[in-house]
Each structure stands twice: as C-alpha cells, then as structure tokens.
C-alpha cells in the first residue's frame, strides 16, 4: 500500500500519517524532512538530494508520505501512490489547530521539528493562505486526472471514519 497525504499546514497530515502507520504497520515519511536537514541548524537540501531521498523511499513496497510539497521533485510520490488523501479542511478548523499546536509547543507539551518561536504562528497562517491560493488549485487539477485515486476529507470528524473509507483502496 502506497499512501500520499496532502493538505495545508495544520490540517492534520502528520497525525493522520501516524495513525495509518500504526493501523497498517507501514512506515511514514514527512516531506518536510526530505526538504530540510535538521542537524542543529536548518539547511535546505538541494533538488538532487531531495530526489535521491524520495527515490529511496519510493523503492519500498509500502509507504506513507505526508506533506504539502507538490514541486517537481515530489510529483513521483503522487504518481506512484495507490491512494492520495487530500485534507481539505475549513480554514477555521486549520487556524484553530495551528493555535493549539503553537500553545502546546511553546509549553513544551508537544515536540516540534523546527525552531518554535512566537512569530511562527503568523508564518503558518501566511503559508495556509498561500496553500489556498497556489497549491489547492494545482491539487484540484491533479484530482481530475485520476479521481479514483483521491480521497478528499472536508471535515475533521471525517478523519475518524477514514479507516472504513480506506478499505476500498486495500
């Protein structure tokens, strides 16, 4: 089973990837970790490094890849996926989840893979707006090419139903 999860920042991609990983006993990978080397300081990988890292993951029999990235280096993960889950949640839900995440990270209740700063919430709101303006139209266009591969989640409570809905792809 090859699963690709796409959605805006704060839509629940990582949470869902972890759940699916546990349910199906499949390793999950975050595209952010493909893009960024996080060894003390954050360094963006070159396109060649990203492609090589992704290629290594894609060679596995089963995988779950989550992330917002749709650039050329990441498209192979969409092409090879058996199912693509698009978390298309309402902006109000995403903003609420981002606020909760920021508070938990600042209080050190939840770990982050990036430096947690007070201005990060503002950046995430900006990235969410960019997703709606730039990425979402690209996703909608790709969905038309292979609609049978796509599973669109419009509300957070639908995520709880996903195991039932995933049965059709197994």
Say what each PLM segment does:
Residues 2:
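Walker A (P-loop) ATP-phosphate-binding motif of ABC ATPase nucleotide-binding domains
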Residues 5:
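Hydrophobic anchor at the beta1->P-loop junction of P-loop NTPases
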Residues 9:
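The conserved Walker
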Residues 13:
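Conserved lysine of the Walker
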Residues 18, 22-61:
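Conserved substrate/cofactor phosphate-moiety recognition/catalytic segment
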Residues 23, 127-170:
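NTP-dependent small-molecule kinase module
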Residues 51-92:
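Glycine-rich phosphate-binding loop used to anchor ATP phosphates in small-molecule kinases
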Residues 88-134:
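A glycine- and Lys/Arg-enriched "phosphate-lid" helix/loop adjacent to the NTP-binding pocket
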């Amino acid at each position: 089973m090859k699963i690709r999860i796409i959605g805006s920042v704060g839509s629940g991609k990582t949470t869902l990837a972890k759940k699916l990983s546990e349910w199906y006993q499949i390793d999950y990978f975050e595209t952010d970790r493909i893009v960024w080397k996080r060894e003390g300081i954050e360094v963006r990988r070159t396109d060649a490094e990203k492609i090589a890292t992704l290629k290594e993951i894609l060679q596995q029999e089963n995988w779950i890849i989550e992330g917002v990235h749709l650039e050329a280096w990441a498209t192979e993960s969409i092409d090879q996926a058996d199912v693509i889950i698009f978390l298309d949640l309402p902006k109000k839900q995403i903003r609420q989840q981002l606020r909760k995440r920021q508070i938990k990270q600042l209080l050190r209740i939840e770990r982050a893979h990036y430096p947690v700063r007070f201005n990060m919430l503002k950046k995430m709101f900006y990235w969410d707006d960019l997703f709606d303006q730039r990425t979402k139209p690209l996703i909608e266009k790709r969905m038309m090419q292979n609609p049978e591969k796509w599973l669109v989640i419009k509300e957070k409570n639908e995520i709880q139903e996903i195991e039932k809905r995933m049965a059709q792809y197994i």
